[in-house]
A protein has these predicted regions:
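Charged, low-complexity helical/coil segments in non-catalytic cytosolic or luminal regions
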Residues: 9-138, 147, 177-181
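Conserved small/polar residues in nucleotide/adenosyl-binding loops
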Residues: 182-189
Length: 193
């Protein structure tokens, strides 16, 4: 997930889940279940093609990690199971949320498990539009971390929701991939934090 609070509320993706049709409409869902998954493949992105990650979702009682209660244009939201929250809380760092006026161009990091373990990858925030009409595209990012470029080509489909950290604070999440660049860029949302 992009974030979770100390009481287990989570937000993820940074964009909603679509209905699977060409209309691009949101899937109507006011309840659902969240399950763990295992990353099984990475299709490297390149200019003109976004790349993607693939995985296997494990369904069943032992793999259930939470419940979903909202699917919106800004992401999915819900409640982590108490066992899952205890496990995450023991391992993770809590970050304060930056105010809009604290976000600036320059270095930042994305947190992702794309390598199979939770890691931080270096980014550069290249543009900020604090008046963006599309709340899911408030800034542009460029991957500067050679490890991520080597692994996936940059930001790829399936990395939506990866939190973006700047100056020790969470400033948003990866939401979209732009394929017109050699090292794939991402757009970010911060309105849902």
């Amino acid at each position: 997930s992009t974030y979770y609070t100390k009481d287990g509320r989570f937000g993820a993706l940074g964009h909603g889940i679509g209905d699977g049709t060409q209309s691009g409409n949101l899937l109507y869902a006011n309840s659902g279940d969240l399950y763990s998954m295992k990353l099984t493949k990475i299709k490297k992105g390149k200019a003109g093609a976004p790349g993607e990650i693939g995985g296997v979702v494990y369904f069943g009682k032992k793999s259930h990690i939470g419940t979903l209660d909202c699917n919106s244009n800004l992401g999915i939201y819900g409640q982590l199971d108490s066992d899952e929250l205890s496990e995450y809380a023991a391992e993770d760092t809590y970050y304060p949320v930056a105010g809009k006026d604290e976000i600036h161009t320059g270095s930042a990091q994305m947190i992702s498990e794309i390598s199979g373990k939770l890691e931080k990858y270096n980014l550069e925030i290249t543009n900020i539009d604090k008046k963006a009409t599309d709340t899911n595209k408030g800034m542009e990012l460029k991957v500067t971390d050679d490890r991520l470029i080597e692994l996936s080509g940059g930001i790829v489909q399936g990395t939506s929701g990866s939190p973006i950290i700047q100056d020790g604070k969470i400033i948003g999440a990866v939401t979209h991939v732009s394929v017109s660049y050699t090292h794939l860029r991402a757009h970010e949302t911060r309105s849902n934090l």
